[in-house]
Amino acid sequence: MLTPLTGRSVIVTGASKGIGKGIALRFGAVGAKVLVVSRKIEDAEAVAGEIVAAGGTARGVAADVSSADDMTAMAEAAVAAHGGIDILCANAGIFPTVPLAEMSVGDYDKVMDTNVKGTFLAVTACLPAMKAKRNGRIVLTSSITGPITGVPFMTHYAASKAAQLGFMRAAALELAPWRITVNAVLPGNIATEGLAGLGPEHVKQMEASVPLRRLGSVFDIANAALFLASDEASYITAQSIVVDGGQILPEGGMMAPELDPAA
């Protein structure tokens, strides 16, 4: 049974597709009032419409997480529409691939602006409303790439995701007096629109690298975010939950053999 969050005001950034959409839909399903945030208003409103059609409460807003003005307006919209801010799921992120030797300062800055500065701006914009309530939940979507593993051609992305965890720990300590917790979810390979675009053979290879022999669902990540935002996680802060089907476990690529279907 999913933890009910009836009436809680939640903001989800990067919520028009993939993991962010899964998080928004899951929070809507448990009674939260969801502010769906995307760069394009039509995309945000489409996801909000799905939540409303399923009996939930949601509103879509357009905002760029790398813009301080947009993040301030986002927080104000949540307060105006839903009476405050209880939960922030800072999910927005980009993950382009560029060989390190060919990476420009612009390539690097674009990733850092969205993934690191965007996290900072989203969190700080929501703090006044959370501090006023002396309570809050902040959940970051990080990655196993950077904090735990490395991937070729994604040096800037790996650096940004590792930076998020440093931010998480320091922020958790600083915000604890207001009973605001700060945690992170670290996804492994998740079945999203972007991953499907790599082609079936590449997807098969990725599935084979996971001990549970499947890619994760966006709802696997959403369920972890939901737990960290719940009352049951009120004594958990500065922690990261790896949701990867055991992807980081195999030593030297060694995994248990497949089961015989006939056994």
Language model features: what each stretch is:
Residues V123, S160, M168:
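Active-site helix of classical SDR
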Residues A176, T181, I236-A238:
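Short, small/polar-rich loop/turn modules that mediate ligand/substrate recognition or access, typified
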Residues P128, L173-E174, S234:
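Alpha-helical segment proximal to the catalytic Tyr-Lys
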